Amino acid sequence: MTPLLWAQTSNNLGAACFALAKRTNEDYLLQEAAACFQGAIQVFRQLRGQKKREKVIAQNLLRVEQMLNEDEDAA
């Protein structure tokens, strides 16, 4: 698998975990989404012509982190 395909797959897995977390309120899914997005960002950062994807994934990661912080504040 090429790095680009791996990063795309990691991003897709992160998006799926994020969607499930919003429906189930399971923190472990948010943590998994964050890890997937972070991995995808690292790879996209190394590839040429992927700045836009990196930016979109970083925004998704920020949303996940905000939800995790909200959960910590509520506890």
Which ranges hold each PLM region?
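Short coil/turn connectors between adjacent alpha-helices in alpha-solenoid helical repeat scaffolds
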Residues: 1, 18-32, 67-75
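Flexible helix-coil transition and linker loops at the boundaries of alpha-helical arrays
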Residues: 1-6, 43-50
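Conserved alpha-helical positions within TPR/SEL1-like repeat arrays
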Residues: 4-19, 52-67
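Small-residue (primarily alanine) positions within well-ordered alpha-helices
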Residues: 14-16, 33, 40
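Charged/polar positions within long, soluble alpha-helices
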Residues: 42-45, 66-69
